[in-house]
Amino acid sequence: MTKVPTLEEILRAFCNPSPDLINDFTRSAQLNHASRYDTIVAQDQICDRFIILRSGMTRIVHRTDDSEDTLLFGTSGDVFTAMQSYVYGKPSRLGVEAITRSEYWAISYHRFRSMTECYPELITWLSNYLMGQTATLEDFYLTLKSKSAEERLLRLIDREHSYFEPEKFDKLTKIVPSRILAQYLGITPSSLSRIRKNLIERAKRQNNAT
């Protein structure tokens, strides 16, 4: 079972918070619940809060009149906000949708800005978080351009293992619908099905050889 992070742990991941900041941050965060496929942040609307995922899984999605793209997935401890809204007061270019039943904390921009005036380390937290997000997006872009769909799938299943375990894929597809997973990989659902079949057959051959 995935460990559910505390707000203190999320703060400490990107700064050295004072006890007062931890207390104030915790009091300011409102816990919300989302059902599967609920919209947490609406595309093309002004976002007015930071979203911190406590449990569950979300996706960052972009829609046009005739297409839909899944850009990234979010899990426990991930933070999201629309920087177009936070910096410029403009509508969000992206949306956030729950893939599973999820819990998330929300902190309004107004409250967050008030806290930055009292706690400079919160600015450090935001800066370090944004640098981490930039690094993640760079990695995602390079992986998308330089790796095959099969390699991208293996990376998503388990970043720490270079081999394929069929049960990992089965677990992932029970959480993430094939349509959404194919969007993320930049392939069609039928191509995803072929890749899955090839990987499972390869894994069986490797198991038989040992």
Model-based region annotation:
Residues 111-148, 152:
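A small-molecule sensor/coupling module
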Residues 1-36, 79, 85:
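Cyclic nucleotide-binding regulatory module and flanking cytosolic helices
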